[in-house]
Amino acid sequence: ASFEPSIDYVITKIPRFAFEKFPGSEPILTTQMKSVGEAMAVGRTWQESFNKALRSLETGLNGWGLNPKDGEMLADPEALKKALTVPNPARVVAIHEAFMSGMTAEDIRKLTDFDPWYLRQMEDLFQTENWLKGLSGVSDLDKQDWLEVKRRGFCDIQIARALKITEGEVRKARIGQDVRASLKRVDT
């Protein structure tokens, strides 16, 4: 039987840099190949695949935002500005820190020269993170909210950090709303 494939997924690949393995090397990205591998993730949206890919890098990130080290760059605005202007492995984390500091997507674009589409996607993730932080508890999330948060790629640990509860409590509430992980087949 013939059928037309549907392209209803996004693939995001993110290189993995390990400058700690190369003492004396500058953690600045240039035209020279410096990655030691990459992570690839598939999702229904760019935000979902982006969050999944960041988790897959094995660098301690739970995704984009709601990580244990969030806010570390805020103490030194000049270091944050340098992390945004100079291509480096932590640049994507620096963009999150820039949003935390109150910068707009346009401010960040001027410093990074990132495409505005990606910055709008990241800004939406940041706004969703702040919305989650503003909730009084996991009971504030109805099934539609859960589906939207998951569509953006937020994992249970990120939601738990936002709500200041355990990952187990998040999982129990999510399953209580009948929102479960699922696998999809890629048709091409």
Model-derived regions: residue spans:
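ATP-dependent carboxylate/acyl-activation modules
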Residues: 1-188
